[in-house]
């Protein structure tokens, strides 16, 4: 193509070339291929089959990309109907006919360690995020409950019993790790591990853990309290438990063999009331109120007596084994006193609740350790339904590990259907932002959180909404599950707060995304040192690091978020390119593919598209198939175009230099005419072949200026052109225009300041008062990531 002189845009030879190019663009716009062939067809016809289906692929791929794009005009892809179609495209399968999960009776339950972060991290890592995390709250609009026996999905009908048994083992492991609550009654649950501060006020004293179920036992009268001696039977010792009769004090003694007996020793109210060894004490908290003038027991002795009462109540089984009437009534009375005690809000004194795993001195001996193993009891401010809200099943850990099982929880009722919730959005960097924030030329280390979601505690009332079951026992998630749309948002808040503290405390560039951390520093030695310090810092607060997935030492090339990041560039691994090329080669031209299968194919193409010379408009036919939910058929030329995209692999530069060149070319258009003006004073006016929408006429002139002058930037008064949203245009023209303007800077200029506005009105161009601005959207980068 001859290059025109910028001072003489009105040369006849250049004008003839420009007229030819303009007519080609207009023909591309006016072609109705998209309006006719890309509409959903009612039936599959023979014309869908491409005549070049058997042609070799590679010779055509060697052609330039612009030539391949033009060839698709004569052989476009097609949309079909909703009849059953192929669900397999290479290794990709449609979601309707995914490969069935195979049950493995020898599945191993993975090791699930207790994950409990210390609340001291709130003071060490100050952030506003903690108020959303301590505890996290989940309030669905409405809930659909299912019966307990349907808690396990019948994924493997032939192995349902074995499946439920493995699910039971898995849930028990989660319960032992403190991740689940286990239902005891309508108002009572139990859990393992240390408690949180918001759980403390709802705790039932562990001293009465064996009788905790009696709190809600309606068979026992709630009005029963400590029975006083008002009966007429004076000699019945079972009726005067806990009462003082004429100075006699009824004491309860524990014998060596574990049985109990009553003693009726007469004691002076001012004398020592504790028995030998402190194993027995005067019982009767109501007796002091009955005789206030005769019993002035000091506070210390009363506290000691209550402690012995609690020690006695830990052994209900021995009491019930005794067959005497008096002992039976004592046990019933003691149960009622426990019930009365647990109705009051529980506040724990220092050292009264040893946390699980601590090895402090226990004054109560092995009994306290036994209660610790049994877990803590929680009487929440909500009811715990004997129903489930999510169904569960087991699958393979991943495609590479089929020996271990993974628990899948289906809480989809909260994300779709009538109970669908709108979960909060959070900042997620796209590829352009990631290129801007990653520092250049620094060694890097990546860290990975282990069991990341299980670091996030839930409020007890929210836990009651997340109920699962193995078919027999009901469990509630005490920590955030992975099957709820709120969990990624909570994890983002959690890692963001930690990442900000790591960056300020250790003077290192830190970026966190979900459960991944990326640390960068100019000095490899310093980075290696602080990586160990960071791991120690996190582990001190109970945050677990997956050392198998972290980088042991600083490296220059690292894999992060699916990208391969070096000192200066980022690219996609070659293995992913090979897999995608293999999928494209296995496309059968002219055959119908289900839109769900096409949807998965689009996802893979979108991930690699920024690293190619293509654009998003090339995938528009497949997007149309997914939008209309109809089948899709590839043509031979379209298959070649997709394969051509995978051949032009490129790598992206980190921290690219943003240049804003001075504009030297301006374009303008009316419904009938278009003009191109150069800063040197030359201009050219063109007449359109027909009247079209003004935004299409403006785009035609910008494309013509790019083809004929090839400037670095162009002035235009069309916001439609500046935003480059061409999805509503005919497909071939949109794909060609997007490809043509990919690396071109477009400036918006008001119409009255547009130099090309004059030639369209038969006036000379005016470059003296040009006011322009780029309309590109500014990239949002958090303040703490803008330092480097």
From Swiss-Prot:
Residues 376-565 form the Reverse transcriptase domain. GO terms for molecular function: DNA binding; DNA-directed DNA polymerase activity; metal ion binding; RNA-directed DNA polymerase activity; RNA-DNA hybrid ribonuclease activity. InterPro entries: DNA/RNA_pol_sf (IPR043502), DNApol_viral_C (IPR001462), DNApol_viral_N (IPR000201), Hepadnavirus_pol/RT (IPR052055), Rev_trsase/Diguanyl_cyclase (IPR043128), RT_dom (IPR000477). Residues 1-200 are annotated as: Terminal protein domain (TP). One of its GO terms (biological process) is DNA replication. Residues 201-370 are annotated as: Spacer. Residues 230-381 are annotated as: Disordered. Residues 334-350 have a biased composition (Polar residues). Keywords: DNA replication, DNA-binding, DNA-directed DNA polymerase, Endonuclease, Hydrolase, Magnesium, Metal-binding, Multifunctional enzyme, Nuclease, Nucleotidyltransferase, RNA-directed DNA polymerase, Transferase. It comes from the Viruses. Residues 656-788 are annotated as: RnaseH domain (RH). Residues 293-304 have a biased composition (Basic residues). It catalyses: DNA(n) + a 2'-deoxyribonucleoside 5'-triphosphate = DNA(n+1) + diphosphate; Endonucleolytic cleavage to 5'-phosphomonoester. Activated by host HSP70 and HSP40 in vitro to be able to bind the epsilon loop of the pgRNA. Because deletion of the RNase H region renders the protein partly chaperone-independent, the chaperones may be needed indirectly to relieve occlusion of the RNA-binding site by this domain. Its EC number is 2.7.7.7, 2.7.7.49, 3.1.26.4. The record marks 96 as: Priming of reverse-transcription by covalently linking the first nucleotide of the (-)DNA. Mg(2+) binds at residues 448, 515-516. Multifunctional enzyme that converts the viral RNA genome into dsDNA in viral cytoplasmic capsids. This enzyme displays a DNA polymerase activity that can copy either DNA or RNA templates, and a ribonuclease H (RNase H) activity that cleaves the RNA strand of RNA-DNA heteroduplexes in a partially processive 3'- to 5'-endonucleasic mode. Neo-synthesized pregenomic RNA (pgRNA) are encapsidated together with the P protein, and reverse-transcribed inside the nucleocapsid. Terminal protein domain (TP) is hepadnavirus-specific. Spacer domain is highly variable and separates the TP and RT domains. Polymerase/reverse-transcriptase domain (RT) and ribonuclease H domain (RH) are similar to retrovirus reverse transcriptase/RNase H. Belongs to the hepadnaviridae P protein family. This is Protein P. It comes from Heron hepatitis B virus. The lineage of its organism: Viruses, Riboviria, Pararnavirae, Artverviricota, Revtraviricetes.
């Amino acid at each position: 193509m001859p290059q025109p002189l910028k001072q003489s845009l009105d040369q006849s030879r250049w004008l003839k070339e420009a007229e030819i190019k303009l007519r080609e663009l207009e023909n591309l716009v006016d072609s109705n291929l998209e309006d006719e062939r890309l509409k959903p067809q009612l039936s599959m016809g023979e014309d869908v089959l491409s005549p070049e289906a058997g042609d070799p692929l590679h010779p055509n791929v060697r052609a330039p990309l612009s030539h391949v794009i033009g060839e698709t005009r004569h052989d476009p892809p097609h949309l079909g109907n909703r009849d059953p179609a192929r669900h397999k495209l290479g290794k990709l399968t449609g979601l309707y006919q995914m490969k069935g999960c195979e049950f493995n009776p020898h599945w191993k339950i993975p090791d699930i360690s207790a994950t409990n972060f210390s609340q001291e991290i709130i003071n060490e890592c100050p952030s506003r995020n903690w108020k959303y995390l301590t505890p996290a709250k989940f309030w669905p609009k409405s809930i659909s409950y299912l019966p307990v026996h349907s808690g396990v999905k019948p994924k493997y009908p032939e192995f349902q019993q074995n499946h439920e048994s493995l699910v039971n083992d898995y849930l028990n492991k989660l319960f032992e790790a403190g991740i689940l609550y286990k239902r005891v009654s309508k108002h009572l649950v139990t859990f393992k591990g240390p408690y949180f501060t918001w759980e403390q006020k709802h705790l039932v004293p562990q001293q009465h853990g064996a009788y905790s179920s009696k709190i809600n036992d309606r068979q026992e009268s709630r009005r029963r309290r400590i029975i006083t001696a008002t009966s007429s039977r004076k000699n019945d010792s079972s009726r005067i438990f806990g009462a003082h009769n004429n100075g006699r004090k009824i004491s309860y003694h524990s014998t060596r063999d574990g049985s109990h007996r009553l003693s009726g020793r007469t004691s002076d109210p001012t004398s020592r009331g504790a028995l030998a060894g402190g194993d027995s004490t005067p019982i009767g908290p109501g007796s002091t109120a009955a005789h206030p003038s005769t019993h002035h027991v000091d506070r210390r002795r009363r506290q000691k007596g209550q402690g012995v009462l609690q020690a006695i109540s830990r052994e209900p089984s021995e009491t019930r084994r005794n067959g005497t009437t008096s002992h039976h009534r004592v046990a019933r009375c003691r149960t009622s006193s426990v019930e009365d005690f647990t109705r009051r809000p529980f506040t724990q004194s220092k050292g009264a609740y040893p946390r699980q795993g601590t090895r402090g001195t226990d004054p109560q001996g092995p009994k306290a350790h036994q209660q610790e193993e049994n877990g803590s009891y929680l009487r929440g401010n909500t009811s715990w339904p004997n129903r489930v809200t999510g169904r569960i099943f087991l699958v393979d850990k991943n495609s590479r590990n089929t020996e271990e099982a993974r628990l899948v929880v289906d809480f989809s009722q909260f994300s779709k259907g009538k109970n669908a919730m709108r979960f909060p959005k959070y900042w997620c960097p796209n590829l352009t932002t990631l290129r801007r924030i990653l520092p250049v030329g620094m060694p890097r280390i990546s860290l990975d959180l282990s069991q990341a979601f299980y670091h996030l505690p839930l409020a007890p009332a929210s836990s009651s909404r997340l109920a699962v079951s193995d078919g027999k026992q009901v469990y509630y998630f005490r920590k955030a599950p992975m099957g709820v749309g709120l969990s990624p948002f909570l994890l983002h808040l959690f890692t963001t707060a930690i990442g900000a503290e790591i960056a300020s405390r250790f003077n290192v560039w830190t970026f966190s995304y979900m459960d991944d951390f990326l640390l960068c520093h100019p000095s490899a030695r310093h980075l290696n040192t602080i990586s160990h310090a960071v791991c120690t810092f996190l582990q001190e607060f109970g945050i677990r690091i997956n050392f198998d997935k972290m980088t042991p030492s600083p490296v220059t090339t690292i894999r992060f978020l699916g990208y391969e990041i070096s000192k200066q560039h980022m690219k996609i691994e070659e293995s992913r390119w090979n897999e995608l090329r293999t999928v494209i080669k296995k496309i059968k031209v002219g055959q119908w593919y289900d839109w769900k299968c096409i949807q998965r194919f689009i996802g893979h193409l979108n991930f690699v598209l920024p690293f190619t010379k293509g654009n998003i408009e090339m995938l528009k036919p497949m997007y149309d198939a997914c939008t209309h939910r109809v089948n899709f058929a590839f043509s031979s030329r379209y298959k070649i175009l997709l394969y051509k995209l995978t051949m032009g692999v490129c790598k992206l530069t980190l921290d690219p230099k943003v240049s804003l060149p001075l504009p030297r070319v301006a374009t303008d258009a009316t419904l009938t005419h278009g003009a191109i003006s150069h800063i040197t004073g030359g201009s050219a006016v063109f007449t359109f072949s027909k009247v079209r929408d003004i935004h299409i006429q403006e785009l035609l002139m910008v494309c013509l200026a790019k083809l004929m002058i090839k400037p670095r930037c162009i002035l235009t008064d069309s916001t439609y052109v500046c935003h480059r949203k061409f999805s509503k245009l005919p497909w071939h023209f949109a794909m060609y225009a997007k490809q043509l303007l990919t690396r071109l800077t477009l400036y918006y200029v008001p119409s009255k300041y547009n130099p090309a506005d004059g030639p369209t009105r038969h006036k000379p161009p005016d470059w003296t008062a040009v006011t322009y601005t780029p309309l590109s959207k500014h990239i949002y980068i958090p303040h703490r990531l803008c330092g480097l």
